Amino acid sequence: MSFDIAKYPTLALVDSTSELRLLPKESLPKLCDELRRYLLDSVSRSSGHFASGLGTVELTVALHYVYNTPFDQLIWDVGHQAYPHKILTGRRDKIGTIRQKGGLHPFPWRGESEYDVLSVGHSSTSISAGIGIAVAAEKEGKDRRTVCVIGDGAITAGMAFEAMNHAGDIKPDMLVILNDNEMSISENVGALNNHLAQLLSGKLYSSLREGGKKVFSGVPPIKELLKRTEEHIKGMVVPGTLFEELGFNYIGPVDGHDVLGLITTLKNMRDLKGPQFLHIMTKKGRGYEPAEKDPITFHAVPKFDPSSGCLPKSSGGLPSYSKIFGDWLCETAAKDSKLMAITPAMREGSGMVEFSRKFPDRYFDVAIAEQHAVTFAAGLAIGGYKPIVAIYSTFLQRAYDQVLHDVAIQKLPVMFAIDRAGIVGADGQTHQGAFDLSYLRCIPEMVIMTPGDENECRQMLYTGYHYNDGPTAVRYPRGNAVGVELTPLEKLPIGKGLVKRQGEKLAILNFGTLLPEAAKVAESLNATLVDMRFVKPLDETLILEMAERHEVLITLEENAIMGGAGSGVNEVLMAHRKVVPVLNIGLPDFFIPQGTQDEARAELGLDAAGIEAKIKDWLA
């Protein structure tokens, strides 16, 4: 869409932060209003993360107005909230391309702009990176400032507290801003707190505080009394004890939608030494009433009509794999009181809403704490329960040691329901589920299953849940099921594949998601098609039989080729000295950028036409 100068006259004056800083302060509330309306207009036309950005408009304007970006370095945690940042930093006219193939990256991305200091996508990384950047800036000696913006969800992760603990120890000059949009830490916002924040962030208070420490440094009892008195006075109105104990100077909470007040506070804090912590209160979805009322639904949106106040309803077609999992979960929980389900802050995405309502005492949302989620599940298993960790493939990476050390070594019956496995699409490199087969396959005695359709997915969930000799994993894709009939649940024989079609000369060994495409290719090439079902243990007998009866083997998976299921087939053949040509087809050795799933598969040659072309080229 083209930018409408008449509709956004103030925003039209700002295509860079240097232009922003030329505006008089009095015009900034109008700029914020236009920026919020432009964001609504753009994202409703193109789709994307929505509610978070509406809540950070004033903060974004204030930060770029006060700090000399990009010389001063601004780090956004996760990046859902960074759309206004992109608009103000030279990408205003391209915001309608965000999350699309060849368009703006969905998150801050170093390769896209010098204003994007840290490439992000997963949460809770900003403070750790910010400490490193701040230390580097101090050694550089050019008076470069470092600011990290983190949300109240991301700050629940252990990594954020590890970083703050370190910052409190080494005391770099940096500012951490907590964007609290869920009222989860404090509701204590108002004129008194805003006034107090400006006082506490001012140079007078800072110098008095430091001067007082120096004056009374030789008189321990009085120094301690002064410290306690100061903390008592602040503690009456400021809920910052935790952050102060970690070594930060805590300011807030302040109104995150008062752009002029934010500018005053940020200017006061800009020159303070040591780690500073500013707590701001915002409303997710600010300025668009439907998003304010339902920020979860409006967190990420498809194209929609803003005047309707509603998102388009699903066409009511095939269920998603997440729903298949959620339905199975409720069905199983109704029969077995030992079932416990765990999610690291992905209730809606993992299909667990109904379960959380029906079985609240057996539903555990541990927040953004993947490591804790896995070891918590280990504890439940030790206690005699049957834990299921529902987690996206890309986020399971964050808990790899816990899978190994706390679950697998102890052979605990924890089941991992791995959603978003394979190509995910619009969220790009940071969210593709490209690696789980590779990093799980090497874990001793792990059972790994890859369904080719929704019925198989249910059977595998049932099989994994009733397996008691160690951990299991069922990995399934983002998107809708394929429409097969659901049959009664029964346990599958562990490590056994299934021949779906008999052919000649060529055998396709398929692992999971691409089974429908593999079936088309097998029909076209008159190839044998095997639904391998298990990545670990592999059906070695069936693999050797296929090698004996065919001239060529093809392995097919939506996982990295390196270390994936195909590599396992190669290892079996080598171990048995079977010399047969094998073509491994899967995800290539690079990080896959954003685009729709269909676009990515077509570009990577993982649709039916692409798979057939790869095979023919290899055989030629």
Curated annotation (Swiss-Prot):
<dbReference type="GO" id="GO:0016114">
    <property type="term" value="P:terpenoid biosynthetic process"/>
</dbReference>
<dbReference type="GO" id="GO:0005829">
    <property type="term" value="C:cytosol"/>
</dbReference>
<feature type="binding site">
    <location>
        <position position="181"/>
    </location>
    <ligand>
        <name>Mg(2+)</name>
    </ligand>
</feature>
<feature type="binding site">
    <location>
        <position position="181"/>
    </location>
    <ligand>
        <name>thiamine diphosphate</name>
    </ligand>
</feature>
<dbReference type="InterPro" id="IPR033248">
    <property type="entry name" value="Transketolase_C"/>
</dbReference>
<feature type="binding site">
    <location>
        <position position="288"/>
    </location>
    <ligand>
        <name>thiamine diphosphate</name>
    </ligand>
</feature>
<keyword id="KW-0460">Magnesium</keyword>
<protein>
    <recommendedName>
        <fullName>1-deoxy-D-xylulose-5-phosphate synthase</fullName>
        <ecNumber>2.2.1.7</ecNumber>
    </recommendedName>
</protein>
<dbReference type="Pfam" id="PF02780">
    <property type="entry name" value="Transketolase_C"/>
</dbReference>
<dbReference type="InterPro" id="IPR020826">
    <property type="entry name" value="Transketolase_BS"/>
</dbReference>
<feature type="binding site">
    <location>
        <begin position="121"/>
        <end position="123"/>
    </location>
    <ligand>
        <name>thiamine diphosphate</name>
    </ligand>
</feature>
<keyword id="KW-0786">Thiamine pyrophosphate</keyword>
<dbReference type="GO" id="GO:0019288">
    <property type="term" value="P:isopentenyl diphosphate biosynthetic process, methylerythritol 4-phosphate pathway"/>
</dbReference>
<keyword id="KW-0479">Metal-binding</keyword>
<feature type="binding site">
    <location>
        <position position="370"/>
    </location>
    <ligand>
        <name>thiamine diphosphate</name>
    </ligand>
</feature>
<keyword id="KW-0808">Transferase</keyword>
<dbReference type="GO" id="GO:0008661">
    <property type="term" value="F:1-deoxy-D-xylulose-5-phosphate synthase activity"/>
</dbReference>
<keyword id="KW-0414">Isoprene biosynthesis</keyword>
<comment type="similarity">
    <text>Belongs to the transketolase family. DXPS subfamily.</text>
</comment>
<comment type="subunit">
    <text>Homodimer.</text>
</comment>
<dbReference type="GO" id="GO:0009228">
    <property type="term" value="P:thiamine biosynthetic process"/>
</dbReference>
<comment type="function">
    <text>Catalyzes the acyloin condensation reaction between C atoms 2 and 3 of pyruvate and glyceraldehyde 3-phosphate to yield 1-deoxy-D-xylulose-5-phosphate (DXP).</text>
</comment>
<comment type="pathway">
    <text>Metabolic intermediate biosynthesis; 1-deoxy-D-xylulose 5-phosphate biosynthesis; 1-deoxy-D-xylulose 5-phosphate from D-glyceraldehyde 3-phosphate and pyruvate: step 1/1.</text>
</comment>
<dbReference type="Pfam" id="PF13292">
    <property type="entry name" value="DXP_synthase_N"/>
</dbReference>
<dbReference type="Pfam" id="PF02779">
    <property type="entry name" value="Transket_pyr"/>
</dbReference>
<dbReference type="InterPro" id="IPR005477">
    <property type="entry name" value="Dxylulose-5-P_synthase"/>
</dbReference>
<dbReference type="InterPro" id="IPR005475">
    <property type="entry name" value="Transketolase-like_Pyr-bd"/>
</dbReference>
<keyword id="KW-0784">Thiamine biosynthesis</keyword>
<dbReference type="GO" id="GO:0030976">
    <property type="term" value="F:thiamine pyrophosphate binding"/>
</dbReference>
<feature type="binding site">
    <location>
        <begin position="153"/>
        <end position="154"/>
    </location>
    <ligand>
        <name>thiamine diphosphate</name>
    </ligand>
</feature>
<feature type="binding site">
    <location>
        <position position="80"/>
    </location>
    <ligand>
        <name>thiamine diphosphate</name>
    </ligand>
</feature>
<feature type="binding site">
    <location>
        <position position="152"/>
    </location>
    <ligand>
        <name>Mg(2+)</name>
    </ligand>
</feature>
<dbReference type="InterPro" id="IPR029061">
    <property type="entry name" value="THDP-binding"/>
</dbReference>
<dbReference type="GO" id="GO:0000287">
    <property type="term" value="F:magnesium ion binding"/>
</dbReference>
<dbReference type="GO" id="GO:0052865">
    <property type="term" value="P:1-deoxy-D-xylulose 5-phosphate biosynthetic process"/>
</dbReference>
<dbReference type="InterPro" id="IPR009014">
    <property type="entry name" value="Transketo_C/PFOR_II"/>
</dbReference>
<dbReference type="InterPro" id="IPR049557">
    <property type="entry name" value="Transketolase_CS"/>
</dbReference>
